Amino acid sequence: MTKSELIERLAGQQSHVPTKVVEDAVKEMLEHMAGTLAEGERIEIRGFGSFSLHYRAPRVGRNPKTGAKVELEGKYVPHFKPGKELRDRANIYG
């Protein structure tokens, strides 16, 4: 599901709320979450999961075109850990 599809689905479920308001709310929520992670804070949504940053240590990589070794710096990457309720709901096919 894309962000646009999410907005359409939410707007369809909340017919009394204009689509533009739903779009603004979704965009604001995602922007706030990204900003919170950028500040190094963890986000926990009970029953859904938690978002945090994981550190990737510096390493030697390779340029895929030339095969030359490239030094890659350490960096923080976003990480999502699903909550138990989400894992259980997603496991209906397993």
Swiss-Prot record:
HAMAP family: IHF_beta (MF_00381). Keywords: DNA recombination, DNA-binding, Transcription, Transcription regulation, Translation regulation. GO terms for molecular function: DNA binding; structural constituent of chromatin. SUPFAM superfamilies: IHF-like DNA-binding proteins. One of its GO terms (cellular component) is chromosome. Pfam families: Bac_DNA_binding (PF00216). This is Integration host factor subunit beta. This protein is one of the two subunits of integration host factor, a specific DNA-binding protein that functions in genetic recombination as well as in transcriptional and translational control. NCBIfam families: hip, PRK00199.1. Belongs to the bacterial histone-like protein family. GO terms for biological process: DNA recombination; regulation of DNA-templated transcription; regulation of translation. The gene is ihfB. Heterodimer of an alpha and a beta chain. The lineage of its organism: Bacteria, Pseudomonadati, Pseudomonadota, Gammaproteobacteria, Enterobacterales. PROSITE patterns: HISTONE_LIKE. InterPro entries: Hist_DNA-bd (IPR000119), Histone-like_DNA-bd_CS (IPR020816), IHF-like_DNA-bd_dom_sf (IPR010992), IHF_beta (IPR005685).
